[in-house]
A protein has these predicted regions:
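Catalytic core of membrane glycerolipid acyltransferases/transacylases, capturing the structured
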Residues: 29-51, 77-132
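Short gly/ser/thr-rich secondary-structure transition/capping motifs
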Residues: 64-72, 129-133, 193-196
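Non-catalytic C-terminal accessory region of glycerolipid acyltransferases
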Residues: 134-261
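Short amphipathic alpha-helical segments and helix-helix/interface helices
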Residues: 58, 96-99, 119-120, 138-139, ...
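Short, basic/glycine-rich phosphate-binding loops at helix/coil junctions
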Residues: 54-55, 117-122, 212-217
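Membrane-anchoring hydrophobic helices of lipid-metabolizing enzymes
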Residues: 1-82
Length: 261
């Protein structure tokens, strides 16, 4: 019976998210475009509204047991500026949960396909960048105080037993001399929103997300900076893959009990 209740709650939350996304992407964005001319001001207003919307949805999901979230060291994200933030990407809910706790100076790298939807304009106004944009162009977009969030797998995790990273995140980190903040995400129900945008049928138990912010990684302490850049990138990427595979596997049996932080 409780599973049926959570399934109904999942449908409700999905509808609420969809209506909110359409409203923000069209009506709200249009109003802000009409009355706010300053580009930076427009960006900050939209980022604030999206963050607050996501915080509300995460709270509703917790109240109705759609999923629960356990954070560790998440407050560090709100205090950091000028970092490359990376994370594994096991489900479609990851971005929503993470963005609800990022500071407003964080730029997000989004899938290129989103730029071909009705969300294209609001994505542009929020200062987000496509994942097919080269590192040099991203550098011109970011200010010195900006963070950038990148999912180095390039898509959702397909094989949780061994994560494989693209080199875009480390390439950007090394070329712009920006330290890396790793985020490790583990979900107690691995199939929850892992391969579908929406699944009305709730898992037997309430999914619990364990989201942990790791220590800052300064690549200059890990690799020889006198090596050619391509070798530095390869070595740092290999290091991050090993780090994530070790951390994710060690978390297999340690997902915390259902609660929201």
């Amino acid at each position: 019976m409780f599973r049926l209740y959570r399934s109904i709650a999942t449908v409700f939350v999905f509808l609420m998210f969809s209506v909110g996304a359409v409203t923000l992407g069209t009506v709200v964005n249009l109003i802000i475009e009409l009355f706010v001319r300053n580009k930076d001001k427009k960006q900050q207003i939209l980022r604030y509204l999206v963050k607050k919307s996501f915080q509300f949805i995460v709270r509703i999901c917790s109240i109705f047991s759609v999923f629960k979230v356990k954070f560790r060291n998440i407050d560090l994200l709100e205090q950091k500026h000028g970092y490359v933030i990376i994370s594994n990407h096991p489900t479609l809910a990851d971005y929503l949960i993470l963005y609800s706790r990022l500071n407003n100076s964080t730029t997000v790298m989004v899938a290129d396909k989103l730029n071909r939807t009705f969300m294209r304009k609001i994505i542009c106004n929020m200062g987000y960048v496509s994942n097919n944009v080269d590192a040099e162009k991203i550098t011109t977009i970011l200010s010195d105080s900006d963070n950038i969030l990148i999912f180095p797998e390039g898509t959702r995790t397909r094989n949780s037993k061994y994560l494989k990273f693209h080199r875009g995140a480390v390439n950007f980190s090394i070329r712009n001399q920006m330290p890396i903040i790793p985020i490790f995400i583990k979900c107690s129900e691995p199939t929850f929103l892992s391969d579908k945008f929406f699944n009305w049928k709730a898992p037997e138990t309430t999914p619990v997300f364990s989201i942990s912010v790791g220590n800052v990684i300064d690549y200059r302490n890990l690799i020889n900076t006198n090596d050619p850049t391509s070798i530095q990138i390869r070595k740092l990427n290999n290091y991050l893959e090993k780090l994530y595979n070790r951390e994710i596997q060690s978390a297999e049996e340690t997902v915390p009990p259902s609660q929201n932080d």
